[in-house]
Amino acid sequence: NGAKISRFNRVTDIITLPTGGYEVITEQGNIIAEHVVNAAGCFAPEVGRMVGAHVPIINLEHQYLITEDHPDIAALVKEMPVTRDSTASAYICQEGNGLLVGPYETRGSKPWAIKGMDWNFDRELFAGDLVRLMPWLERCMELVPLFEEVGVKTIINGPITHTPDDNFLVGPVAGLTNFWNMTGASIGIAQGGIGKYMAQWMVHGQTELNMASLDSRRFGPWADKKYCITRAIESYERMYASASPTENRPHGRPIRTSSLHTVMAQKDAVHFVSAGFEKPAWFKTESIREESETWTHNEAHAVVAEECAAVQNTCGITDISGTAKFRVTGPDAYAFLDRLSCNKLPTKDGRISLTLFHAENGGIMAEQTVSRINQEHFVLMGAIGCQIKDMQWLQQHVGDYQVTIEDFSEDWGGVLLTGPKAREILQTMCEDDLSNNAFAWLSCQTIQLDSAPVFAMRVSYAGELGWELHMPVWQLISIYESLMQFGQPLGLQDFGTRAFNSMRMEKMYRAYGAEFTEEISALEAGMDRFLDLSRHFIGSENLLQRQTVGLSMQLAYLVFDDQIPAECFGNEAVFANGDHSGIITGGAYGYRVEKSLAFAYLKPEHCKAGQALTVETSVGTRHCHVEVDSAYNPNNSLLRS
């Protein structure tokens, strides 16, 4: 039906209608809208506040200059290419017969309008401040000597929006229906693509592209103004910095912590952050206190090896509080989750299953570990980075189902106790029977630890005998300290996410955001044994169609044949017989098997066992082959022990 553009017409308020939709109040009259898109740029936080939405955006000043003409540039036959240089933290390109030079200062950047925007502001520019830019302009002159031969014609200084991670804010706004963000752009050349996928999202409810890194729901209320300012400045000043996999940016932290955070810090944990949540990555030793930023194995490599060895030989414990947790209750709880789940739900109380939720287009929307308490009570656990998105996915599919959904992620914490001595340690402080007959693998029950009820799940992402122990946050320190008291004489040791990731790779366990994304279905991800296509669930028709037509790519498990001290981290190109076959999703060194491991999506014909491959990595070409079984304990005897 076309569209109407109304210019010079300020929106003064937005009213959420009880019948659905919105009434947009403007200076020239009111508009009833089914959908509202917040594409207000610098004003986006103000517009968000009209409907009670938090928009984590900060404006920063950015300057660029245009030079006078230079005869050498005028004489060019082809236009000079756009150049970006990390040492100058700047972009340089041709502008007419002169240059356009835009540095991102790596210190001293200036936030703007942090107390709120003036509604009378309209494309005004600020006074230029070349003195602030001189260190980077001088480096640009070294890179392009003719730059110092010309005068400055124009200085442009204006506000640009920045988010805490410098990615767009796109997609549904949590807690609202049909209210969307399309803002937070600090780069000016991507709006066409963003518009395309935004349209798909609004019309179809999902996109063909994985939008996780842009999804505005990756930030929750925890991303307050102080955090946004600090992180946005850091992101701006590191715009052209080359980040290593071990880079650990300190600003704006900690913002989300486990109740064990201080305890872990006192034990020399090195915390990394995921969705704002602090997670111990590895623990310093007397001899190894720091790690270098590098793409190869660094000082922490030996420490992580010791942590993995403890898990394999005795027992390890790690904080798993940074997990999204949902409680689904009500008469229709089973039927509701059955409609979302691609796997059969547990039919017996106290059983656990792993499942995936799909969109209608077949993309994986969520990975959940589902624990059945009873027919009307289920507990779901998933990735902390998907907490808000997963909650909204659950809520938007409630329909006529009689269910209640509770997010208790912030209220409960937990630890994983795993290793061959896990049962012995746990049994010393627990009167419940923890034998295989009484507490089988992939089952759950409430047990008593220190006379306190703890929700115990017999699962271990590390691939050893183990229990996840979940409890209210106020219990966590006491339970952890008791476990350490009883466990240390038996060799119990802390371990972090670095070791955890290594062990999940050895077990061939996929991860959401890497092997599972909205561009992938359970079929491509090789999750056939967790997929029941005999029943109808959201996305099942698309999966049946994919199964009939055939897959264009499949997930392969790669074991490296060389001993190069470096790993894959994602997005490396994979080749078979010299032809490009696919891309790495992630990798790690397997300390228990002493091999480098990775996952990759490849052409199906290259996913057979033994297929030789090469991978282009940061340290050069590496050789590997495909395996179809996990590198560590493929028959799961240790998990079942």
Model-predicted regions and their roles:
Residues I15-P18, Q94, P172-A174, V370-N374, ...:
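Short, low-complexity Ser/Thr-rich regulatory SLiMs
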